[in-house]
Amino acid sequence: MSTAPAVTYDENSVPPISTVAGTGIAGFKGDGEAAATAQLNRPYGIVVDSTGTLYFSDFQNHRIRKITTDGKISTVAGTGVAGFGGDGGPAVSAQLNWPRELALDSEGALYVADGNNHRVRKITADGKISTVAGAGVAGFSGDGGPATAARLNVPMGVAVDSTGTLYVTEYHNNRVRKITTDGKISTVAGNGAAAFGGDGGPAVSAQLNRPHAVVVDGAGVLYIADGENHRIRKVAADGKISTVAGTGVAGFGGDGGPATSAQLHLPVGLVLDSAGNLYISEFRNHRIRKMTTDGKIGSVAGTGAAAFGGDGGPAAPAQLNHPFGLAVDCVDTLYIADYNNNRMRKIASARLAGLPESGAVVSWASVRSRLRMGVWRESTRDGAEVHQLLAAPRDHQRWRLVAAGQHNGDVLYRIENVRSGKVLEIAGAQQASGAVVAQRAYEGADAHHQQWRLIPVGPVAGASGVYEIANRHSGLLLRVDTNARTVIMQDGAEGDHRSRQWQLLPV
């Protein structure tokens, strides 16, 4: 069960930092158990899928692991033995060799920069692994031909755009290459020389110096962590390259001003949030910086000291130790691979101020009746009705709140029953008042009748943590009009306001 606090922080506080995985001891341990008690060994790349599951490369364990929304950790790829093998079979039985960054496509396939195998591997949603780029021999060759016959040289970063095109940075080739959906490979940035040059001209003629992460925005613009150039480079849709952050002088400085006038020190990780802000992890500055859409830069986490500290408080004075990969979820929670601390950290989203943290397990009490929301007869079947019931310390009355996205600036949740794993929905996706509430397996991001907005209403009759629960599809509120045990329905805002108010109680 999640140990997430019921409410992240209040509206007057700064988003806090916390640890989501790892004890700080380097090793391999904990699969099937709580991620917070697991051992990691140099976590590197990270990505979060649409359901809130977090995947990361456990670099020195030669594995890819995942953390589900209930806080449990497991291995999805790699045996722990460095090597190459297993293509065509289950990813958990395959060998990886110092895996780096990760990316996800729209079909849920996971791409792995399998660095010392000089390959990019793909893990499909059914858990099978294959090679999509690289012949396994370090070098540079193959442009214009099949990506699987090409030579790569320590692929580091991977990104997938909206069309399914895959981008790969190569550390020793000082290039960014792309693999189109027909499997062909080509170079999009870098001429192979480890240097700096070419801004304002074609990216393929420019020079990069040990590139790390790459990300791509919705318009097809690439951002590259140009590591030893201590810069962030941008490749526009027309193929022209420019610098968007960093002077090229290694160091720390420039917060509050233009990112192009700031000093960076070995930028390695990148991620874009939903507003287009770019987050940068700096390996040697032990910091996370943020470049806003107006080109200004600032620090969001880390003091510059290589250490561990600050959990539970604001991220800015917290300590990181050689941070690497970055990721954001659907509500812009920021995840950090805190490499030398052997931990996965997260910074709560500003959008969650005054709202429950994603992953929190709670019970819901009707303000009117004080009865608890629960699945009728503890059923685990699809379509089972949700009632208000006498309070009982059992899982059919416990609900996991998982962020499901944003709509018109509001955070949406799926409300998942702990016993059944099914989510709260309006039966039949009805929009009429009086429609009953039931549980059903989650149907994905387009299932608006299974997504909910929590509307804080403040303390009520001495009770804190009180919300109205509004369905995204219908816009109506969960409501009970009696103190008897009965089915919960959706309705409008008329009548006794207590009948549509629910108190969140931490479990």
Q: What residue ranges belong to the model's regions?
A:
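Short loop/turn segments immediately following the C-termini of beta-strands
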Residues: 59, 115, 171, 227, ...
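A short loop-to-beta-strand structural motif that recurs across blades of beta-propeller domains
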Residues: 62-66, 118-121, 174-178, 184, ...
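Gly/Pro-rich loop segments of beta-rich domains
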Residues: 9-42, 72-98, 128-154, 184-210, ...
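Conserved beta-propeller blade signature
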Residues: 53-55, 110-111, 165-167, 222-223, ...
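Residue-level detector of Asp-centered blade-edge/turn motifs that repeat once per structural unit
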Residues: 48-51, 104-107, 160-163, 216-219, ...
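Extracellular glycan-recognition/adhesion modules and their associated mucin-like linkers
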Residues: 354-381, 398-431, 447-484, 501-507
